[in-house]
Amino acid sequence: IVPTYSARSGTGGPVATADLDRLISELLERVESESNIDGVYLSLHGAMAGESEDDPEGKVLEGIRRHVGDVPLMASMDLHGIITDKLIEGIDAISFLHTYPHIDAYETGERAAINLLKMLDGEIKNPTTGRVQIPMLARGNELITRTGKFGEAIRACQSIETSEGGIAAGVNIGNPFTDV
């Protein structure tokens, strides 16, 4: 296990191009400085946007995948993250937060790490990542995960995760402040 990079920020609009370029290049330099990488785990929020890059996480995944090749690549992600084509193409599986308000970050990271270990052990073979986009808008007060339709959708995803062949499932609502 080789920790490579950690960055954190609050909501604040698009990241300046120079700052985003530096962040991505520093992260990729650290990954590229390692050889014989067996697998990768990323803890992402998923709703970052830059002044000149709408999909920073996808760009990071492209760079990591280019370096590590065909090794298991697992992520955990906030349910406010935006699932892009680049993200789906670059990742093997994603474990999503299942709570809003967010109280399951530790458990989500644990699920992702366990799934990565199962991929490395050969217990999970050839995972497939997909996305179904549902044309809907929901008010914030309807997104509490303990109750209501959103909570029912989360519980359906948890059922998928524990079913035979299920690895990870989630409902992502995106981020209303990231207009991409």
Q: Where do the language-model regions lie?
A:
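N-terminal glycine-rich anion-binding loop in soluble enzyme alpha/beta folds
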Residues: 1-30
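Active-site-proximal beta-alpha loop/turn segments in soluble metabolic enzymes
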Residues: 9-13, 45-50, 101, 133-142
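Active-site histidine-anchored catalytic micro-motif
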Residues: 17-24, 32-119
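Core alpha/beta catalytic barrel or barrel-like domain that forms the active/cofactor pocket
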Residues: 42-45, 129, 177
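Short acidic (Asp/Glu) and glycine-rich catalytic loops that position anionic groups and cofactors
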Residues: 92-96, 132-136, 180
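Active-site catalytic microenvironments in core metabolic enzymes, especially phosphate/sugar-handling
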Residues: 102-108, 130-139, 169-175
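Internal, active-site/partner-interface "lid" segment
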Residues: 120-148
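Hard-cation-handling environments
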Residues: 141-180
